[in-house]
């Protein structure tokens, strides 16, 4: 549609000691650096954000606008999306990454140093608590329930039709 979406990627590779020996440029083996642009979303966490202009704005066959309007609106959409994303990331990415790092570090610390020792302690103590609870049940609650059961077992009811 007249809009360039491919990035022009130019890279120059120099060996560390090449500059000190002569003033010319040493070109490194380009096959070593084939995968220089790595995927920033390898686990596809944000695959739902891969929307294009056609995914958001669609004109049915019966209601087409002028071609120039469609091309200009598509170009404006892509440019504004690109510029606003870059603008927002410049001002928000670093502070939000800092806050997320602090939050993650805090939660990790609490989990490692408080929650897991507490859970392990409870799991170690539970067999002893279970034994004590069984003894209390056998000594106190068992006889109490037995005596209440015997008391109510002597009660009898008779129904008469008057």
From Swiss-Prot:
Residues exposed to the Cytoplasmic side: 1-86, 108-162
A GO term from the CC aspect: plasma membrane raft
PTM per Swiss-Prot/TrEMBL: Phosphorylated on serine and tyrosine residues. CAV1 promotes phosphorylation on Ser-23 which then targets the complex to the plasma membrane, lipid rafts and caveolae. Phosphorylation on Ser-36 appears to modulate mitosis in endothelial cells. Phosphorylation on both Tyr-19 and Tyr-27 is required for insulin-induced 'Ser-727' phosphorylation of STAT3 and its activation. Phosphorylation on Tyr-19 is required for insulin-induced phosphorylation of MAPK1 and DNA binding of STAT3. Tyrosine phosphorylation is induced by both EGF and insulin.
Top-level taxonomic group: Eukaryota
Positions of modified residues (Phosphotyrosine): 19, 27
Intramembrane residue windows: 87-107
Main location, first listed in the record: nucleus
Membrane protein topology class: Peripheral membrane protein
Modified residue annotations for Phosphoserine: 20, 23, 36
A molecular-function term among this protein's GO annotations: protein heterodimerization activity
Family statement drawn from the similarity comment of this UniProt entry: Belongs to the caveolin family.
Binding partners and assembly: Monomer or homodimer. Interacts with CAV1; the interaction forms a stable heterooligomeric complex that is required for targeting to lipid rafts and for caveolae formation. Tyrosine phosphorylated forms do not form heterooligomers with the Tyr-19-phosphorylated form existing as a monomer or dimer, and the Tyr-27-form as a monomer only. Interacts (tyrosine phosphorylated form) with the SH2 domain-containing proteins, RASA1, NCK1 and SRC. Interacts (tyrosine phosphorylated form) with INSR, the interaction (Tyr-27-phosphorylated form) is increased on insulin stimulation.
Name of this protein: Caveolin-2
């Amino acid at each position: 549609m007249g809009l360039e979406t491919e990035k022009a990627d130019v890279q120059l590779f120099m060996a560390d000691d090449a500059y000190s020996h002569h003033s010319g440029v040493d070109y490194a083996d380009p096959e070593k650096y084939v995968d220089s642009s790595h995927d920033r979303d390898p686990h596809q966490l944000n695959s739902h954000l891969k929307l294009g202009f056609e995914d958001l704005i669609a004109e049915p066959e019966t209601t087409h606008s002028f071609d120039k309007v469609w091309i200009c609106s598509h170009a404006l959409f892509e440019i504004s999306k690109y510029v606003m994303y870059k603008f927002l990331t410049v001002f928000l990415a670093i502070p939000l990454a800092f806050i997320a790092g602090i939050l993650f570090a805090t939660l990790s610390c609490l989990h490692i140093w408080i929650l897991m020792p507490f859970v392990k302690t409870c799991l170690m103590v539970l067999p002893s608590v279970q034994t004590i609870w069984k003894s209390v049940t056998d000594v106190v609650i068992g006889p109490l329930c037995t005596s209440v059961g015997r008391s109510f077992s002597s009660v009898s009811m008779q129904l008469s039709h008057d």
